[in-house]
Amino acid sequence: MEEYKTICFLVADILLIAAGTIYGWKFLKKRNYLLGLECWIVAISATNLLFSALLFSVPGFEGVSLTLYGNAMYLDAFSRAVGIPLIGMAGLMAVTHAYHPSKTADILWFAGGFAAAGILIVVAPENRHILGQFGESALVHAVESIKPWFYLVMWSLFSCFLLYFAWRLFKVGERLHGWSMLVAMVAGQTIATIYDFFEIPGDDADQTLFFIAALSTWAFLAMAMYYAYCAIERSKPATTLAKARVGQPYRTAGS
């Protein structure tokens, strides 16, 4: 049973790496750097998690495994706090609200996200020593205590936007993609709710069952977002698509 769970975990992780890499590249080809780079960040996080799991039991590589796991958790904090909820939302707004930020704005989105992730990681009990005496301050403890709720609120905001995104898909007749976004929204919100608050019955100390579900859900989300994005893009007038390809802002009725 344990071997079966391990295999399922590895398969789910590889699926997320593949989805993040492939659809990240596809978004980048559409010049949507927000969604493209965020998908790649998710893929890099999953890659670190994969090799951390593979090397954990290899003699002499325990330190490398822990470093890779730390990298994965930092990027996970980035994606949960800012990357998917805010950057993902902003990226999808390219086809719903004609939002096309400048390269400077793109950089600021990610710089702000990485800074926020750093704060969220450093307040964890195992990392507070980095802050010295300030690590035991009331402020640090307060940030750590509200962190799970912060993650949940941010993902819930993203789920609300996905509901709107699904409505836009139904509005243009893309029912299949509308339903795929609703499924992705429900699954993603379920994972976000379970993450810091509940345990799956029968799960082990490493939360293997949870991570199988989470990694699979995020892989599906990346795929569903890309094809839903393309579906709304197809509904735009030809002149709109031409402007989008050269990176010009565009407006359409209802945008």
Can you annotate each of these PLM segments?
Residues F161-S255:
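C-terminal transmembrane-bundle signature of multipass membrane proteins
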Residues G36-F61, V183-F198:
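Hydrophobic alpha-helical transmembrane segments of multi-pass membrane proteins
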Residues A18-F27, S52-V64, L68-G112:
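Internal transmembrane alpha-helix with an interfacial aromatic "cap," most often the third helix
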